[in-house]
Every structure is written in structure tokens, then in C-alpha cells.
Amino acid sequence: MKDTVSQPAGGRGATAPRPADAASPSCGSSPSADSVSVVLAGGGTAGHVEPAMAVADALVALDPRVRITALGTLRGLETRLVPQRGYHLELITAVPMPRKPGGDLARLPSRVWRAVREARDVLDDVDADVVVGFGGYVALPAYLAARGLPLPPRRRRRIPVVIHEANARAGLANRVGAHTADRVLSAVPDSGLRRAEVVGVPVRASIAALDRAVLRAEARAHFGFPDDARVLLVFGGSQGAVSLNRAVSGAAADLAAAGVCVLHAHGPQNVLELRRRAQGDPPYVAVPYLDRMELAYAAADLVICRAGAMTVAEVSAVGLPAIYVPLPIGNGEQRLNALPVVNAGGGMVVADAALTPELVARQVAGLLTDPARLAAMTAAAARVGHRDAAGQVARAALAVATGAGARTTT
């Protein structure tokens, strides 16, 4: 088995050990007569890469013979995340969409076709049976290549495409690709993609299979919380969130007075200013990041977090009530991501500008001292969460790959 990164121009390979809890994949470069070759096109941010890796693990669990190739670019997190998960990565030219007229816009067509040619070479090299796309810079070239482009110098076979959209508002690549895709899957009903089947967002197996009640005692001991504690979990993504850090740390005294323990991942570049803990105060555990999110989720009773698609998917999948604080940029995508859970009663949305220490103290203390309301929110979050999204996407990919039958030529 070879877990490598291949650059567009034939760069050096890179290897990484595979996590112990992940299935053993088949490398994309070892074809066999009866194995299915799947190309996963999802790069750039963790929101694109993590669902792809969850689907990769689900594919291997369904069919250990499957050959998986991840498609990415040099500028994305996939150069680190994919080899860490033990999968083969092929790199193509990144084609970001220019935000304003200029030289980048004039060069866009040539960059697109270069990326399409590179993607097509990868599809041919691994004898791809299906492309599963997750949006982002790498997806559109993969979709076009799968359609049989570019045509010269020889006629190309068409490769089936399955699209997954994690966000409540579909991005450009998936909007374009959905017109000709064989299957279109989405996280929520109103993504804007025609023919979309709602499956949720694929999450890691360690999260999808998490039984918080079973793991709670171990998780709380791990972080130093009493078994009967009321625990607030706070995180703002891999880099933390300054506004969440300020609001929650500013409420530390009030939270302690209410008997609330805090597990706060503040980000590796951030420092929390916390008051000196008084004797008898509940623990306030501040860490740069959490590398065992399943333990963090199991320890918690309530979460304050951003509302990225992956965050909402994981928090709802494990049935945690949440106070979602959408990132105040873009077109409100994060707020839309949280709305299905909020509308079902599994959480609430607080605007970033409205998140103050006073609000944190009032809302958190109110929720954690109201067992009936917290239990209702927990049940609502669990009903909305999708634990088998990765399996559903994987099964769709295998069905399309094997059920498409004869490969058509365009």
C-alpha cells in the first residue's frame, strides 16, 4: 500500500502513518479487474476535505477492494490531511474564481482548461469508475473532466459523477456540476441544487458512532471534570474564534458561580485572559486545540461554537444542544447551516456582535440549570443529526460506479 502525494508535474511522494481507528485503504494506483476506482474531488478547506475522508473510510468499510484517489491542489489542507488518513493524493492546478476584473480573470480560461487536462489525466491513470465531488477549487475541473473534456486528441469516455453539497447554499462548482451529475446529495433540503437527496454531512466514524452516555465518565475524567458536572464546551474551529474567546472567558466568574465547568479550545495562536480560579470553583480547562473531539463531545452538556457545515453536522450527529455563533462574513451561509437544527429545537443562533459575557452567563446558566429544557434540546438535535451520511454517500458512489454499466463515449 502506498500513501502518497503526487504533484501535477510529477512531484515527490509523501507518506504518513494511518490513524489506528481508520480502515485500511487501497491505493489509487493498484488496479485489479474486480475493484472499483473512486476519485474523491474535495480540497481547499477542512469543510471540503473532511467529508471526503469520511466517505473514503466508509467506502473501504463497504468494499475493502475499492481503490481510492483523492484529488486536490497544492494550496489546500488536503496536502496534509489526506496523507495523514492514509490515502493517495493527486494534485492539479488550483483555479480560484477572481473576485474582481483584472489579469487573473483574463487568465481564467487557460487555467481552467489546464486543470481539466490534469484532472482528466488522473482519471485515466487510475481508470476511474466514478468521481465523487464535494465542491471547492478542485471539483469543477474534475466534473468537466469526468464529462469527457477535453475532447482532443482522442474521444473520451464519460465517467459518472456523484456530488455532495455540505453547505446550506451551494457553491459555484457544485451548482455547475449538478446539471449533469448522476446523483446529487446535500446536507439540507434547500441547498439550491435540483434533484438533491438530503443525506446530511459525512462525519468521521469516531463521531458518527459516538455514544456520549457510554463514554461520558471516561471523557470527564480525561479533562478533570467531576462525573456529575455541568459542562460547557467552547470551540471556534481549528484556529479558534476571538469573539467566542472574549465572551466566554469574560463570563468565567458568573459561570463558576453557577457551577458550570468549561472546556475551551481557544486556538493555537490565541491566549485567554482568565481570572485566578478561587478555591472550590468548577474547573475551567483552556487548551489550544482538541485532538480528541469525541471525548470533548462526550464530556459536554452544551456547546458554544461557530456554524460551519462540518461543525453543525458533528454537533447534531452526537445530539448536543448548541449555541451557534455564525461567522459574520460572506452571505450568511453559516447561519443557514444552523437553521435546520435551530428550527427543530436543538439549538439557538446568536449573532457574533451580540455575543457578550453577560449573554453567555445568562443563556448558559439558564440552560444548564434547566434539565427538562436541556433534555428536549438534546433529543431535538439528535433527531436532526445524520450519523450515516458518509455511508449513504459511499453507497451512492458504489451504486453509480457499478450500476452505470457500459462506459459511454462522448
UniProtKB/Swiss-Prot annotation:
Provide the GO MF annotations for this entry: glycosyltransferase activity; UDP-N-acetyl-D-glucosamine:N-acetylmuramoyl-L-alanyl-D-glutamyl-meso-2,6-diaminopimelyl-D-alanyl-D-alanine-diphosphoundecaprenol 4-beta-N-acetylglucosaminlytransferase activity; undecaprenyldiphospho-muramoylpentapeptide beta-N-acetylglucosaminyltransferase activity
Q: Could you tell me where the Low complexity compositional bias lies? A: 14-35
Can you supply one Gene Ontology CC term for this chain's record?
plasma membrane
- Could you say which EC number(s) this protein's record lists? 2.4.1.227
Ranges where the record places region Disordered: 1-35
| Swiss-Prot/TrEMBL keywords | Cell cycle, Cell division, Cell membrane, Cell shape, Cell wall biogenesis/degradation, Glycosyltransferase, Membrane, Peptidoglycan synthesis, Transferase
Q: Does the keyword Ribonucleoprotein apply?
A: no
Cite the InterPro entries for this sequence.
GlcNAc_MurG, Glyco_trans_28_C, GlycoTrans_28_N
| Keyword S-adenosyl-L-methionine listed | no
Its localization reads: Cell membrane
Residues the entry annotates as binding UDP-N-acetyl-alpha-D-glucosamine: 45-47, 167, 204, 238, 334
What other comment is given for this protein? Answer: Was identified as a high-confidence drug target.
The UniProt entry, under PANTHER family, shows: GLYCOSYLTRANSFERASE, UDP-N-ACETYLGLUCOSAMINE--N-ACETYLMURAMYL-(PENTAPEPTIDE) PYROPHOSPHORYL-UNDECAPRENOL N-ACETYLGLUCOSAMINE TRANSFERASE 1
Q: What is this protein called?
A: UDP-N-acetylglucosamine--N-acetylmuramyl-(pentapeptide) pyrophosphoryl-undecaprenol N-acetylglucosamine transferase
* Source organism per UniProt: Mycobacterium tuberculosis (strain ATCC 25618 / H37Rv)
Q: What lineage is on file?
A: Bacteria, Bacillati, Actinomycetota, Actinomycetes, Mycobacteriales
Gene name per UniProt? murG
